[in-house]
Regions:
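Proline-aspartate-enriched helix->loop->beta-strand connector
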Residues: 120-133, 263-279
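Alpha-helical, coiled-coil/dimerization segments enriched in small aliphatic residues
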Residues: 96-98, 231-259
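Bacterial Sec-exported substrate-binding components of ABC uptake systems
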Residues: 1-77, 185-222, 332-340
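Short secondary-structure boundary segments
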Residues: 73, 135-138, 162, 277-281, ...
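Structured C-terminal subdomain patch of bacterial secreted/periplasmic proteins
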Residues: 173-182, 273-340
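Extracytoplasmic ligand-binding site segments that recognize negatively charged/polar headgroups
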Residues: 98, 137-145, 155-185, 216-239, ...
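Short helix-initiation/N-cap motifs at beta->coil->alpha
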Residues: 53-57, 111-121, 141, 254-263
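A short, structured surface patch at a secondary-structure boundary
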Residues: 68-126, 130, 135-139
Length: 340
């Protein structure tokens, strides 16, 4: 197990109980001007260790690149795979869906600890030197155990900075700069600086190549729920992605990552298009059927004319899949505009 020097005590920003798929767990910030990052790497040059890192107010020092990594949530697992460190994954948990096809070979033999949050005992049995989580609540008493406990046992923990829930650590809004900063920082932690730089450069180029729609279309980001829909609000990954595509979010005024929005409010907003989140537990097709049988939404032009865009659930949380989601949704939107 890699040595760990604790740089600071837990600052009290551990999350509350674990939430289910699609829940508004991370208090992420959304698009627009850059917000201060809640994570900070040491001033050491790239590739230098020891390396001090901080996420959500919890500081630690990695004495060397971790060799035994446990990830919780798809965003964390896919980040490690994308940076070429999949052979150091000794366990994963809480997958939100299949990994991208290009990462599937590297993920094929990685052990799966649990469908949701693993027990802390199961994690510790693997003797990890890093536990990397996508949600702050993944590392809590109701999740895979408190971060302080891991610290006391010499195990480093890291939470996606966009997922910090404490007001003093949470970015005001999610931006692509913050997403790419996480790629850079995780690359430094893993000793994969070059791979991280290449991924960041590729994603910046891909994002720059996207031409947002200028049609002024409004959109509803429909994640889950039938009695009351659960939708993308104004400061998280859905807002960031819609901005990049050129869609006006009908729930942009809600200062949260996700929110409940009554069907009557949806009907009043009368969105031009509906973005459907496709998850194994709540498919895009199921959401189409829900919209078509709901008397409040069945008469909406977007529903009657099937003006739908589809995005996979793992791409809806801050991570390396956000930029590809922009490219894909922009292409879908262009086809939809031609069809109209």
């Amino acid at each position: 197990m890699a040595g760990l020097a604790v740089a600071a005590l837990l600052s009290g920003c551990a999350g509350s109980g674990a939430t289910g798929p699609g829940a508004a767990d991370p208090g992420v910030a959304g698009p627009g001007e850059a917000a201060p990052s809640s994570s900070a790497a040491s001033a050491s040059p790239a590739g230098a260790f020891p390396l001090a890192v901080s996420s959500c107010g919890v500081d630690a020092t990695l004495e060397e690149p971790p060799e035994r990594i446990v990830t919780i949530k798809s965003s964390a697992t896919e980040m490690v795979l994308a940076l070429g460190a999949g052979d150091r994954l000794v366990g994963t948990a809480f997958a939100d869906g299949d990994v991208p096809a290009e990462l599937a070979p590297a993920a094929a033999d990685v052990p799966v600890l649990a469908e949701k949050n693993p027990a802390q005992e199961a994690v510790l049995e693997l003797e990890p030197d890093l536990v990397y989580a996508g949600w702050e609540s993944n590392l809590s008493a109701d999740g895979a155990g408190e971060r302080q406990t891991y610290q006391d046992l010499g195990v480093a923990t890291y939470v996606s900075p966009s997922a910090c829930k404490g007001a003093e650590h949470r970015p005001e809004r999610l931006t692509f700069d913050l997403v790419l900063e996480e790629i850079t920082e995780v690359g430094r932690m893993l000793g994969e600086d070059e791979a991280a730089a290449e991924l960041v450069a590729a994603q910046r180029a891909e994002l720059d190549a996207v031409v947002p729609s200028g049609a002024g279309l409004t959109a509803l980001w429909y994640s889950s729920g039938e009695d009351v829909p659960y939708v993308g609000a104004g400061i998280g990954a859905p807002q960031m992605i819609m901005d990049a595509v050129g869609l006006e979010n009908v729930a942009a005024g809600v200062q949260d990552t996700w929110t409940s929005l009554g069907w009557e409010a949806v009907a009043e907003a009368n969105p031009d298009v509906v973005v459907l989140v496709d998850a194994a537990w709540n498919t895009a097709e199921h959401k189409k059927e829900a919209l078509e049988r709901n008397p409040v939404t069945a008469t909406l032009p977007a529903v009657q004319e099937e003006r739908y865009l589809v995005v996979p659930f793992p791409a809806t949380e801050a991570g390396m899949r956000n930029v590809p989601a922009v490219t894909d949704l922009a292409a879908q939107l262009a086809e939809l505009e031609v069809a109209r």
